[in-house]
Regions:
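N-terminal leader/linker segments that precede catalytic domains of diphosphate-processing enzymes
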Residues: 1-267
């Protein structure tokens, strides 16, 4: 933790100066030690200020710092049509229901190998992985005290996926729910991020942190607007949910809407 070394040395110096004989060496050691204590406090306060947006995560440095944490770094699309939000059916048996278009960010394995080894980052195998999910940023950090350094790497945008276009294509265009020719390019805006502190997982045998960037699709022309509206006619693969249904966690017909869906709603 920032400032800990200086502060500790300063405290030890102050204690030592108390037992020293002779005014001059005692005064010198006292002044040096007091300076180290002040420097340690200042360094710690600067650290708190620089990480002010993550104060709720700083507790990982002192509360169970050596315990593992599961981390999911994802992005979600907000696609709104006349006050309703486009959701897609999730077919995996472990957690079925409707959810926003989106998914986990990908990372570059070889480019991040040295960093991830130093941070104790390893794949999360609580959910079976395959060649499509092998490089998903759903990982285990063996010691949660390394969590802030991991998030600093993520914020640097280095050696990881940054564009949400891939999941849009995989979930809507490749299954031919949207015409490929109309969506060769898309426009979107970054709305913000939703990050939860480390919480007890309702599913996995380890605490977890869930992060999601929210992007809003901006249709670029009439053809895109018509195609998005036509998703309403794609059967039960797509559902246009009201904010009330999303908050309630189910459609009007009682079909489950997954809990993380609320993140796409305006705050």
């Amino acid at each position: 933790m920032k400032g800990k070394v200086s502060f500790t040395l300063g405290i030890l110096g102050l204690i030592t100066s108390y037992f020293l004989a002779g005014d001059e060496p005692k005064s010198t050691i006292f002044k040096i030690s007091l300076g180290l204590v002040v420097a340690g406090i200042v360094e710690f306060l600067v650290f708190l200020y620089e990480n002010r947006k993550r104060w709720n995560l700083l507790k990982t440095l002192v509360i169970k710092p050596n315990s593992p944490v599961r981390v999911t770094m994802a992005y979600l699309f907000r696609i709104e049509v006349n006050g309703r939000y486009v959701l897609i059916k999730r077919h995996k048996k472990d957690n079925p229901g409707y959810q926003p278009i989106g998914g986990a960010y990908k990372y570059l394995k070889e480019e991040n190998r040295e960093l991830f080894d130093s941070l104790g980052v390893e794949p999360c195998n609580h959910v079976p992985r395959d060649e499509d999910t092998e490089h998903d940023l759903r990982v285990i950090i063996r010691k949660r005290k390394k969590l802030n350094k991991f998030l600093q790497w993520f914020d640097s945008r280095k050696n990881r996926e940054m564009d949400p276009y891939r999941e849009f294509i995989e979930e809507l265009v490749e299954p031919e729910l949207l015409p490929a020719g109309t969506f060769r390019h898309i426009k979107y805006v970054y709305i913000g991020k939703h990050i939860e502190g480390v919480i007890k997982s309702p599913v996995y045998p380890v605490d977890e942190l869930r992060y999601a960037d929210i992007f809003e699709l901006r249709t670029d022309n009439d053809a895109q607007k018509i195609a998005i509206s036509a998703l309403l006619n794609k059967g039960d693969e797509i559902y246009f949910a009201t904010p009330e249904e999303i908050r309630a966690g189910s459609t009007k017909d009682g079909i489950r809407i997954l809990p993380h869906t609320f993140k796409i709603l305006p705050k």
